[in-house]
């Protein structure tokens, strides 16, 4: 039986030792250029493009087809996504799972909204791997991960609000005042 962990790139995990794992990249649009958030991404080039860009940046979640392709060949699938508050990745994965089950009704798929990003997603992925390695069955793993998610959270600090202002998430005036007063936003 093949058990597979799949995550979008919001987790910043490219591979797992001794586990069936796949990372599906988010796409980041900056000034007419698309950057795939995967191992081929030049972080320095990407950061430079962000600094030089005065316009809006945006992201695109993995497509339903990308999720379905990643599901292929596995009997049990644990798909974890960046928070559904920030991305359509969770909805895309849920739709992909529903469509995939139509042709593969024996495949078990658990789509997990991390309600987070980055390091917290990595913790959930580690807990998934640990649960699989411990020999837990599908239902036990799903229950364990759902309970684990209730105990984790991510705190973060933003050095700048510039990108939030560029993308219409906050007022440019708020970003400017925060910058002048050297205010950093701490969130959870």
Model-predicted regions and their roles:
Residues 3, 10-27, 32-33, 86-89, ...:
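Mixed-charge interfacial surface used for oligomerization/domain docking
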Residues 33-102:
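Class I S-adenosyl-L-methionine
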């Amino acid at each position: 039986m093949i058990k597979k962990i799949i995550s979008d790139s919001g987790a910043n995990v490219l591979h797992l030792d001794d586990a069936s794992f796949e990372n599906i990249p988010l796409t980041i649009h900056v000034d007419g250029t698309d950057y795939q958030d995967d191992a081929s991404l030049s972080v320095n080039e990407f950061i430079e493009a962000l600094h030089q860009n005065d316009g809006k940046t945006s992201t695109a979640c993995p497509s339903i087809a990308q999720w379905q392709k990643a599901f292929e060949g596995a009997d049990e699938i644990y798909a974890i996504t960046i928070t559904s508050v920030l991305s359509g990745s969770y909805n895309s994965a849920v739709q992909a799972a529903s469509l995939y089950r139509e042709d593969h009704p024996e495949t078990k798929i658990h789509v997990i909204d991390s309600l987070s990003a980055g390091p917290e997603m990595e913790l959930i992925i580690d807990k998934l791997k640990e649960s699989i390695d411990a020999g837990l069955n599908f239902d036990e793993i799903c229950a364990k991960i759902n309970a684990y998610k209730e105990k984790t959270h991510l705190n973060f600090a933003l050095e700048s609000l510039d990108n939030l202002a560029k993308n219409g998430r906050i007022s440019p005036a708020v970003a400017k005042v925060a910058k002048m007063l050297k205010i950093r936003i701490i969130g959870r």
